[in-house]
A protein has these predicted regions:
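DUTPase catalytic domain/fold
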Residues: 1-152, 159-166
């Protein structure tokens, strides 16, 4: 369900039959100068079904062509929120961008969620990755490749999707 909050709002639609997300449009024009973020209203409030969440994303065309993105990267609209859905748009480019009234400014999808109960434990189960953080899975792949090749190698040099060893 959705509620139209002002006369400039547009009911969302999917751009194509294969679109995963629906477009949200601005209700008013606004200029966003370089390295500035401004809130852009959609004029819509949603009743997201219980057990679901609405995720709001930047439109790829804005990022690729205009240097625009959502200031919070991904908006999370909970099922109990009933206010206007807005997008805070950040301009990463060197030129002022003029958002026009009726312009597609973001895209959103409504997806099911899993609510979990947290259980505090003394130890977590072990995995091959363990506590390895950023970049650790790439190192694991290199180690597997070398183990499968056998022999002694002095240097690993990743290039694209290939790994060279001597």
């Amino acid at each position: 369900k959705l509620k139209v909050l002002n006369e400039n709002a547009r009911v969302p639609k999917y751009a194509t039959d294969g679109s995963a997300a629906f477009d949200l449009v601005s209700t008013h024009g606004v200029n966003i100068t370089p390295n500035e973020a401004k809130v852009v209203g959609t004029g819509l409030a949603f009743e997201v079904p219980e057990g679901h969440v609405m995720l709001v994303f930047s439109r790829s065309g804005h990022g690729f062509n205009n240097g625009l993105r959502l200031a919070n990267c991904v908006g999370v609209i909970d099922s109990d929120y009933r206010g206007e859905v807005k997008a805070k748009v950040h301009n990463d480019s060197n030129t002022t961008y003029q958002v026009k009234a009726g312009e597609r400014i973001a895209q959103a999808m409504i997806v099911p969620i899993s609510l979990v109960k947290f259980m505090v434990v003394d130890e977590l189960s072990s995995t091959e990755r363990g506590e390895g953080g950023g970049g650790s899975t790439g190192k694991m792949v290199e180690d597997r490749i070398l183990a499968n090749l056998g022999g002694d190698f002095e240097h690993i040099k990743p290039q694209g999707d290939k790994v060279y060893a001597k």
